[in-house]
Curated annotation (Swiss-Prot):
Belongs to the CDP-alcohol phosphatidyltransferase class-I family. It comes from Photorhabdus laumondii subsp. laumondii (strain DSM 15139 / CIP 105565 / TT01). One of its GO terms (molecular function) is CDP-diacylglycerol-glycerol-3-phosphate 3-phosphatidyltransferase activity. Residues 38-60, 108-145 are periplasmic. Keywords: Cell inner membrane, Cell membrane, Lipid biosynthesis, Lipid metabolism, Membrane, Phospholipid biosynthesis, Phospholipid metabolism, Transferase, Transmembrane, Transmembrane helix. GO terms for cellular component: plasma membrane. This is CDP-diacylglycerol--glycerol-3-phosphate 3-phosphatidyltransferase. It is a multi-pass membrane protein.
Length: 182
């Protein structure tokens, strides 16, 4: 297996996860900002690795596998941290919903791939919009420099939660005939 720059960016994103987790727990007033900045860099590599892979025609099966895995680990870690910080059901419930959706859709994609129908549950524009809202919410809720920023994060978290359900139902609907035959 040959590693190209887009795949190295994905590996770099995975390597950043422990650093934003550690930054979250630092006992300094600037720790939330550092945590959010590391998360921003990791989130930027999510966009940049795919862009470069397509631009340079360096898409690989390994990269196609690793990229969504890196995304899910990064987002799940951030959701757990945000849930721990706020320690309330109205943050934990959307976080648990998003993590559950990622597990369900990843499993659905794997199953559809075994049937040779992975393209029917390929990433949709709704999934991309959900991810954008999710990333923005997590940045705001990890950083939380002021009330307005935090409030925006809460609102985006709930927007992302609604989109989480919407996109999940889109994927399930796309696979429904195969699910009924199973």
């Amino acid at each position: 297996m040959q590693l190209n720059i887009p795949t190295w960016l994905t590996l770099f994103r995975i390597a950043l996860i422990p650093f934003f987790v550690l930054a979250f727990y630092l006992p300094f007033t600037w720790a939330p900002m550092v945590c959010a900045i590391i998360f921003i860099v990791a989130a930027a590599t999510d966009w940049f690795d795919g862009f470069l892979a397509r631009l340079w025609k360096q898409t690989t099966r390994f990269g196609a596998f690793l990229d969504p895995v890196a995304d899910k680990i990064m987002v799940a870690a951030a959701l757990v941290l945000v849930s721990e910080h706020y320690h309330t059901w109205w943050i934990t419930l959307p976080a648990a919903t998003m993590i559950a959706r990622e597990i369900i859709i990843s499993s659905l994609r794997e199953w559809m791939a075994e049937l040779g129908k992975r393209s029917s549950v390929a990433v949709s524009w709704m999934g991309k919009v959900k991810t954008t809202a999710q990333m923005a919410a997590l940045i705001a809720l990890l950083w939380r420099p002021n009330f307005e920023f935090e409030l925006g994060g809460f609102i985006l978290l709930y927007v992302a939660t609604v989109m989480t359900f919407w996109s999940m139902f889109q994927y399930i609907n796309a696979a429904w005939s195969d699910l009924r035959e199973a």
